[in-house]
Amino acid sequence: VGVVYNPFNDELFCAERGKGAFLNGDAISVSAETELRRSLIATGFPYIKSTLGPMIPRLHAVLRNCADIRRIGSAALDICFVAVGRLEGYYESLNVWDFAAARLIALEAGAECGHFSEVPDDIDPQFYDNDLLIANPSIYPQLLAVLQAADKA
């Protein structure tokens, strides 16, 4: 079970594995957008500024390839906004408690969830908190390619 509440808009996002995702009791699903250049992508920035380095090339690459970037300020809400189709994708490095509930909601809404860097063999990918990527199924591979290219540049 995953639950995320948005008190500003009185929105309750919830999901149970295998039973779908819901917003205030109504079923939700990711957007049907197929082109990254027409997509809204969300991300966040680290509080520890010494880790900001890789974010800049990624941000630059994503901005060049999508419609726009959003920074809402809550990873859980960013991910839920992907689940309900308000955004097409989200990427960031987080702590697992920041994304666990929202990740289930996004998966149940039809999103693809993974990472844009390699997950160490000794860590379960669903709990790996570095370089998280969540997007609708059409946008996921496009955004993955952009982020991986930015990291290689």
PLM-predicted stretches and their roles:
Residues 1-22, 37:
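DPxDG-like acidic metal-binding loop motif
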Residues 29-153:
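An extended, acidic
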